Design a protein with these regions (language model features):
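Short beta-strand edge/turn micro-motifs at domain boundaries
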Residues: 1, 90-113
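Generic alpha-helical secondary-structure signal
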Residues: 27-28, 46
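Short, low-complexity N-terminal intrinsically disordered segments enriched in polar/charged residues
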Residues: 1-22, 27
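Surface-exposed, charged secondary-structure patches
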Residues: 5, 45-94, 112
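A short gly/proline-enriched turn/hairpin at secondary-structure junctions
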Residues: 28-41
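Short, solvent-exposed loop/turn elements at domain surfaces
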Residues: 24, 36-37, 87
Length: 113
């Protein structure tokens, strides 16, 4: 996939997260999502808490890195620092994206720093 279209897709996730629209945010996640500790339903509850704490603040993604490879299908590993407006630092996150029905979906997300 083209790097620009991947950046646009990740930007769409960022905008959805900053908007506070849980339905929009969760549309980026696979129903098979797992954080290792949480399934899709529990993850949604975590996202709802996170988004309510942001209260519509802008989010910046710093040091965005996208690595793609093929295993059983196309996989993207996306790493970035998520910094909310008014903050100097934030969590470093890693997401794994896979294709489902031709669409990229997040099937794993975790904080790595």
């Amino acid at each position: 996939p083209q790097r620009r279209s991947l950046q646009n897709m990740i930007e769409g996730w960022r905008v959805a997260r900053a908007s506070g629209d849980i339905g929009r945010v969760m549309s980026f996640y696979s129903p098979q999502f797992s954080s290792g500790k949480q399934d899709f339903t529990r993850w949604r509850q975590s996202v709802e808490r996170d988004v309510s704490q942001l209260r519509g603040k802008a989010i910046e993604l710093k040091d965005l890195a996208i690595l793609g490879w093929q295993d059983k299908g196309d996989i993207l590993v996306v790493t970035f620092g998520e910094v909310a407006e008014g903050q100097r630092t934030g969590a470093v996150k890693r997401q794994y994206w896979g294709k489902e029905g031709g669409l990229w979906k997040i099937f794993y997300e975790g904080v790595i720093g």
